[in-house]
Amino acid sequence: MHRRTHRQTHRHRSRVLLASSLAATLAVSTLAVATTAAAEPSDGSPEAVAALTDQAAASLADLPAQRLAPLAQATDVLAPGETAGSPNLAHVANIPKNGGFAPEGQYSTDLAFQGRYAFAGNYGGFTVYDVANPTAPQQVAQVVCPGSQNDISVYGDLLVLSTDSSRSNDSCENVAQSAAIKESWEGIKVFDISEPTAPEYVASVETQCGSHTHSLAPSQDGEELFVYVSSYSPNAAFPDCQPPHDLISVVQIPLDDPAAAELVSTPLLFPDGGNPGGNGSSTTSGCHDITTYPSKDLAAGACMGDGILLDISDRAHPVVTEVVRDTTNFAFWHSATFNNAGTKVVFTDELGGGGAPTCNPTVGPEKGADAIYDIVGGELVFKSYYKIEREQAATENCVAHNGSLIPVPGRDIMVQAWYQGGISVWDFTDSANPVEIAWFDRGPLSAERLILGGSWSAYWYNGAIISNDIQQGLDVLLLDDPVTNAAKSVVTDEFNPQAQPTYTEPPAWSKGTAYAGGTTVTYGGAVWRAQWWTKGQTPGADAWGPWEEIAGVDSAGVGAWKPSRVYVKGDSVTYEGTTYTAKWWTRNQAPGDRWGPWDPQD
């Protein structure tokens, strides 16, 4: 196992230090493992929400590492009710929170997908949406089962739900109860979703310090489902959450008998106690989130003050193989995303616990950001940071949060939620020079006070971006860009962003192979799609030939003009140093002709 603490060298000048994150996913969503159960927003009442906001402010003031830099004067930011975005990303649908999930304190949380359905967590339970038609999604079920934060995953006929707030029991009729009471319960719940519109509760497993998040890893023989449970912030006053807590919990669910789910191990990840904290870095007392890559027997953990790699070839006994720290800019290691090849990891820093306005010039571009690491010889090698450049208002919580890959062959592109900073699509194919290629943003929920809101999770699923907004419910967005359109051909039956699948790259073009229309291949470092049946015709040899180049961008993140590619009105390209926008359908017409299809952009 390797352990390195490093201070980064950056391309941007340093900014005022904005300190460590709260030991909770959301500062204003205080969980019972860290505070008393009285703060649990189980009913979403104005009184409960106000108490949480006051408590979050007090928590920030009480922690020496939580001294926030003064906010810069917000300029050119959206007003409440306004929206904005890049022309290649369209917001096409929204289903507001409703029923018992409507109150402000009932936060919408994570997402999982299966078939035509999206399963959306909420502090009050979970909702099932039919997203087969992304422009007209429908709510088809709502399950009331309180217990924040209801992190959610699906696998086959099973749905797994996390509870990280102390409850009176493991039923869905529970109420908040202090973690200081031995009989209180936290852990995971298992539901049968063989009928997705009518889930049935079948099992529960109590875990130490509850289950803030969880990740799935099916056994190699396909007979069991292993659940890696992440939790943190032990307290000597809590009988079931005693310090030290340098471990995760592993739950095994027999797929032929899910009611027999049980805790099988509690691997010690930090025998030396992990990051001791200080200098703006969080003290490690467990993990916030683990992302598995089951086909590669690999996982990445975001563990408060540490980022780790794990070998999960023995599913019940994962082993840490690499540890890295960033004591200069990372306050709270929150989540991780691999690239498709498993040769990179994007870690997120949830500075301020998700409840603070950190997207402004005072905080700067390197705190509350993503950090891109290459995996070289099993070691994590820092390459760069990525953070949205749009300034957000002082009443908008904004920091890097949950996202997923967009399966573009030959490129590393992800979509990501930034709370009230909106949604960003960005390319990290060049690890040292990430670039944004699309975005969507709403104005603040209020100009007078910070209401915790924005996109908790934004993921790509079968051609659409689906987001769960903390206050405004389910959003669907459609991305139309020549850089990413190849991803629309990738269809999956199931998707849990924290259990990454492997997307199969197109095969290399072969002169002797016959290709039907729609087939994709790689050739000359690019991805090509056959427009019709072809054999023996080299991609790129003839601009009017059967092959259309569908993936490839320049260093600025805009697609370079290619003669073989089909462009439609609104598409942007670069050509000889100038950016152009198509005025109508075009192919093999080079930009530069004032009477042609391309409009130069100043």
Where are the regions a protein language model picked out?
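A residue-level detector for conformationally permissive "hinge/kink" positions
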Residues: S21-A24, I413, I465, N485, ...
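Feature marking well-ordered beta-strand scaffolds used for ligand recognition
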Residues: H2-R4, S20-L22, S29-L31, E40-E505
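N-terminal secretory signal peptides that target proteins for export/translocation
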Residues: M1-R13
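Tryptophan-rich substrate-binding surfaces of secreted polymer-degrading and adhesive proteins
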Residues: P501-D602
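Sec-dependent signal peptide recognition
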Residues: R15-A19
